[in-house]
Amino acid sequence: MVAKKLKKQLHFTLFTFPPFVHHYPDGWRHPQEMLGGIYNPLEPEIWARVARTLESMKVDAFFVGDGGAIYNSNENSPSTSLHYGSQTIEFFAPQFVSMVTAMAPTLGAVSTVNTEELNPWTFSRMAQTMDHLTKGRVGFNIVTGLNPGGLADNLGVEVREHDARYERAEEFLEVCYALWQSWDSDALVRDKERSLFADPKKVREVNYNGRHFQCRGPSQLPRSPQEIPVLFQAGQSPRGRQFAARHAEGVFTISPDLPAMQSYYRDVKDRLVNEGRRKSDLAILTGIFPIVGSSESAAQEKYEQLVELATPEAGLAWCSGYASYNFAQVPFDTKLSE
């Protein structure tokens, strides 16, 4: 008997940094933009409407980014980011995800979580709580480096080198895995006759003692619906791709053109096999930026308006934040090497 070939499933998510909702510098100035005055994006009603719209469209998930801090690398100050609105205000992603999943009871949601910001005990509890309360509808985008400088400034720590952050993240997830699996699936008994709430023989201490983290455990919660929540990754570097191949079930990526997308796809899938996993174990979500209008010409006009609104200063603050580098010290016409 010949095995049937599995059909590929197309997945859609909406990716945004609420209440900041776009990826165009100065895009908030567009007449139809939410941050431009049509709606107050800090109020929950608009996001409930967005979530329910996504739910009705059968979109897989609301994918929520989180930069962790106001970008302050440009001129070593947050002033330019604040002035031009360069990805400045952001909700704490896990709490936002908790709200939208309550507003849209069948919608999936993915929260970005920075391993440099949280410790594994806090994150593991948060993830299990959300997994239980959403009945398994949440995932987490594990990142290590978006705006590392701004985040480190607010935590009072040194900025770790790129690969060192991934090394720490590996240990971070090791602790989480151990905590999430510290209860057997049948450990919660609730037997009134025997006065047995949970079977101690089926709940284990973790006793993790690593270079970066120490944790005794066990988890404070029994196993959640997914046991291990769906993990995503969004790293573009070779180290980030390796991390994704080892841990993720989904990857979010942005590529400049089709050949770059195909190259990224092949590389990550090959790394997946090298980790002993199947290529089908990980979905790759490639970002697109649709400009929507009542007609093609209307959409083109909107695109041209967005380009016209963008200022070099806003873009510079944005790039400086992403790279944690003060690009203001580099002349605008300087060609940057890799």
Where are these regions (language model features)?
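N-terminal beta1-alpha1-beta2 module of alpha/beta enzyme domains
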Residues: 2-103, 226-229
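Active-site-proximal loop/turn and secondary-structure-junction residues that shape catalytic pockets
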Residues: 18, 68, 115-117, 144-148, ...
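An alpha-helical appendage that flanks or caps ligand/catalytic pockets
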Residues: 3-27, 35, 163-226, 259-338
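Hydrophobic faces of well-ordered beta-strands that scaffold small-molecule active sites
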Residues: 10-16, 62-64, 107-113, 136-142, ...
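Conserved, mostly hydrophobic/aromatic
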Residues: 12, 54, 58, 100, ...
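Active-site mouth loops of central-metabolism enzymes
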Residues: 26-45, 111-121, 157-163, 225-238, ...
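Catalytic cores of nucleotide-enabled group-transfer and carboxylate-activating enzymes in metabolic
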Residues: 69-70, 88-92, 99-112, 233, ...
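Hydrophobic or amphipathic alpha-helical targeting/insertion segments
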Residues: 103, 111-154, 160, 168-172
